[in-house]
């Protein structure tokens, strides 16, 4: 199977007995759920503005200049991408983990360009590492089952 096809192939949820006895399977499921739910929740919030009411302040002007429309329009696009990324993680965590890691890298760059958000950028770097770990664990899990 080609590398691309293998990365996109859906990976099933580990069997209950595997989850009970294998810490690696537990870590895989924990990361899979977290990196599916969090992007979907934050993506939905770009529209609902329940958690944060001023998302555009996190968008670097350099990025906003590349995206048509206002900063708020850009945040709606970002929200749609985040929702899609969460769904991809749920179905294909090996590819989804890489997708979320790349997205987080872009967020980190934007936060550093805006300035004043280095603490959030550092937190997002930790999330980026977790997304990469999810992708690697998904690769190992796909081989075992």
Language-model-detected regions and their locations in the chain:
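Membrane-interface extramembranous regions
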Residues: 2-145
